[in-house]
Amino acid sequence: MAIEFDPKSASTRRHDQFEVVADGLGRYTIDVSLPLGHDKEGARFPLILAVDGNLLFDMAQVVLHGGFATVSGMLPPSIVVGVGYPADEGRASFYTRRNYDFHGPWAMTDPLGQRLHAIFNMLKAADGPADIEMRAGGYERFMGFLRDELLPSLATRYPIDLKGRHTLIGDSSGGHFVLRALYDAASPFRRYICISPSFGAADDAIQKSEAEYASAHDDLDVDLFICCGRVEIDQEPFAASCRFGSGVTWIAEQFAIRRWPNARIDWEIMNNEDHGSIQLRAIAAGLRSVHHLRPGVHDAEVKRAQAELLEEIKKKSK
């Protein structure tokens, strides 16, 4: 016997999407996902922001606001924001815009830069437009847009605690951006999830930023989760030239050398993962890590959170 049904498009009232325009940068697609309880009077929440929102927002949303999370998740309620690029601009535009936004000044004449140029030219030949060029150098402007324009504007519409301990997520070139922000004293973020950072890009920019920060500060109050895939390190020349593995271990070593009093790091080379497979696993592990709720790393905190969750369920059942 056939079952009758009337399918309808699934939607959620807790997910908004819109476009904004940043002077000197262009259009951005913004996704916002709200936690349960966001409409309670006086409620305020920290922000979890993913650059490359086209690629990473959905993953973060599932981990934080998906069905499993709403039933038995232990992560604290947060507002998830994705900052991405309009799909109608095409892949070549996406490729050069993110390269510009995520890096500081970089001539891109080195072998890695030339390889990125070659990929861009292939994308440009496929879908244009003809007047765009591959470039870098927009880190300061893009960070200023996030810090001074986007976050305050979002807080006028959504229940964001602007003084909260916000999280930044980035992958690949976005991971490079995360590390630049990590050592940026003006960054509005204090939790960082850095996935497969392109450590070999931009003429040692990460090393220079770290040294500059260390010369002027005696502490770094952050929670950092940094990782890459085991397969990214030694199985393919282009991936190896990006220095994903070197970025993870160098940052871990510098944290050990500097011994910042309030700097916390959790790092991992993830087995059986490559540059295209690591993201969801890394985001899930990273969110638990920077909130001190990762099993095997924060066992006491996990047990306490489990007990609190059980107690909350008991109260609701009475």
Tell where the protein language model's regions lie, with residue ranges:
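Non-catalytic cap/lid and distal C-terminal segments of serine-dependent acyl enzymes
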Residues: 1-318
